[in-house]
Regions:
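Active-site acidic/histidine proton-transfer and metal-coordination neighborhood
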Residues: 58-61, 77-174, 265-266, 279, ...
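Active-site mouth loops of central-metabolism enzymes
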Residues: 2-19, 74-85, 112-118
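Glycine-rich, proline-tolerant flexible connector loops at the mouths of alpha/beta enzymes
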Residues: 36-59, 109-113
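The substrate-binding groove and active-site-proximal loops of carbohydrate-active enzymes
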Residues: 73-81, 116, 179, 223-230
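Conserved beta-strand positions in the central sheet of alpha/beta enzyme cores
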Residues: 36, 68, 104, 141, ...
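Active-site-proximal loop/turn and secondary-structure-junction residues that shape catalytic pockets
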Residues: 9-11, 39-41, 72-75, 107-111, ...
Length: 308
């Protein structure tokens, strides 16, 4: 199994030129040969086909591949001024041109919708994307999102599997996010077994799980790397054994925010805002995410799965 790394965390490094060659080059220096490519609205302007061709060339030059991508997050049921269908059609075409075989497209939600309404609307939404997926032959991945306190109902493996089964199309499969699942107190092994042959991709990251709501922050989608704290509670033995038992074919893809911008309030001293330590340096970022690669290699090696 190959290790992969989502490319979006470099967006948080100040004054770093965010072109594909720079961003993917840094990820490659950390050891990764695969990336989960983050498609933004800026990618999907009138030049999106040229951008996709450039990405494909950069990946080839670096000896990398992008087995999966993430489309812009737009709520199809409350899109504002955005043409969500145009965004998703372009995202699928972008992937085809760039050589990316599958892309995460999030479900939508409306405040106070019931589970029945949520499923009815989202099954119809995903089915409306079938022609756009079939034309380039790119898979759409449904990701687990939400918790008991919000309007999403893709909390558990059974929920996401039900959604994929209701859409009922071979190009519509599942990306399991370990951190999101951990916030909902999921048995990870049982979850992976439930997802079974529909599980085609991962977002691997950690957090401290669920606390009772009396805590100020009882769920925090932290996106930390494994072993970052003694309280991190994703069980990677359960994850990897589940992947083995279902014959998982995808990458072990990290979606971590390790050594990134702090969201703490600004510090003011003598009337001036001080930001000297708000961001890490690029060198610190590289060292930290080289460690992420090494951790992933250690995990996969322990099960005889690592593929360089």
């Amino acid at each position: 199994m190959k290790l992969s790394f989502a490319n979006f965390p470099l967006e948080y490094i100040p004054d770093f030129p965010l072109n594909d060659k720079n961003v993917l080059g840094i990820i490659r220096e950390c050891g990764f040969t695969c990336t989960d490519y983050n498609i933004t609205l800026a990618h999907l302007d009138e030049n999106f086909e040229t951008r996709a061709k450039t990405l494909k060339a950069v990946l080839a030059e670096l000896g990398m591949s992008a087995p999966q991508a993430h489309a812009p997050i737009v709520n199809p049921f409350d899109p504002g001024d955005v043409d969500y269908m145009d965004i998703y059609e372009k995202s699928l075409r972008f992937c085809k041109i760039a050589g990316i075989p599958m892309v995460v497209i999030h479900a939508g939600a409306i405040k106070d919708n019931t589970r029945e309404e949520y499923f009815e609307k989202n099954v119809a939404f995903y089915r409306s994307l079938i022609p756009a997926a079939e034309e380039p032959g790119v898979e759409v991945l449904i990701e687990n999102i939400g918790h008991d306190g919000d309007a999403n109902f893709l909390l558990r493996g059974t929920d996401v599997r039900e959604m994929a089964d209701l859409v009922d199309h071979p190009l519509f499969n599942i990306c399991w996010d370990t951190g999101h699942g951990n916030l909902n107190k999921q048995n990870l092994y049982d979850t992976i077994i439930t997802l079974g042959d529909k599980l085609h991709a991962l977002h691997v990251h950690d957090n401290v799980g669920y606390f009772e709501p009396s805590y100020r922050h009882h769920r925090i989608d932290m996106h930390t790397m494994p072993y970052a704290t003694q309280y991190a509670s994703v069980n990677y033995d359960a994850l990897i054994q589940g992947l083995i038992d279902i014959g998982y074919k995808g990458t072990f893809n990290f979606e971590v925010l390790t050594v990134t911008r702090s969201i703490r309030p600004a510090f003011t001293y003598n009337g001036e805002v001080v930001r000297k330590l708000e961001f890490p340096s690029l060198e610190l970022w590289k060292k930290a995410n080289t460690l992420v690669y090494d951790i992933g290699k250690y995990m996969l090696d322990a099960y005889g799965l690592y593929e360089g």
